[in-house]
Amino acid sequence: MKSETDKEQLILKAAEEEFLEKGYNGAKTTSIAQKAGVTHAMLHYYYRTKEKLFELVFRNKVRLIADSLKYILDENNNFEDAIANFIHVHFEFLKKNPRLVNFVYNEVYSNKENLDILHRSIFPIIQEVLNKLNSLIETEVKKETIKPVNPLQLILNILSVNIMTFIFYPIMIQYSENKSSAYYKQMLKEREESNIQFILNSIRK
């Protein structure tokens, strides 16, 4: 017999799948209950409303993004290794959570309250990363190994090239003659290496 906690987790997992696939407006609590193997009444008993269930899922996903950025810069590495590791860790996070970017973007765009949640969760961590990155950049500029660069612009460039990969690659694969998972994995590996070199070449002196 499933415990209360098991039932709650099953509902939450089913809700994540439903919201990630269909967004808030397209998701149905009846579908979530069916996926979780519980009654519709039980779903509302544990989570009350669709809004409360969505808010929990959204906060969890935003927290996941925030946590992925916390230790992304290792100041003990040399500069290029630190940047390459930043790109790699972020790329791997997106690879493991391919639907997350579109989900967060769509829900933030459609609801200002979600933007506030995102801002409160992400901004302090982004600021910490920027401070670390600025220190690394200043050191490298003094050593004349890189060009002066705004740390925020560098972060935006990194996030952009990685995120665009996971927005467009699934579409491009549909038009490729080779649609195997092995081919897709190889393409992603090559793209990650390309992103690293693109960013490093853009700041090298």
Residue ranges and their predicted role:
Residues 7-16, 32, 57-61, 65, ...:
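Generic hydrophobic, amphipathic alpha-helix propensity
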Residues 10, 18-52, 56-57:
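Helix-turn-helix
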Residues 50, 57, 61, 65, ...:
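Hydrophobic/aromatic residues within well-ordered alpha-helical segments
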Residues 57-85, 119, 123, 136-138:
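Amphipathic alpha-helical linker/stalk segments
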Residues 71-102, 130, 151-158, 205:
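Hydrophobic alpha-helical connector segments
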Residues 81, 120-121, 125, 138-157:
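All-alpha amphipathic helical-bundle segments outside canonical DNA-binding/catalytic cores
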Residues 91-132, 153, 180-186:
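Short secondary-structure transition hinges
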Residues 92, 127, 131-143, 147, ...:
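C-terminal peripheral helix-coil segments that are non-catalytic and often amphipathic
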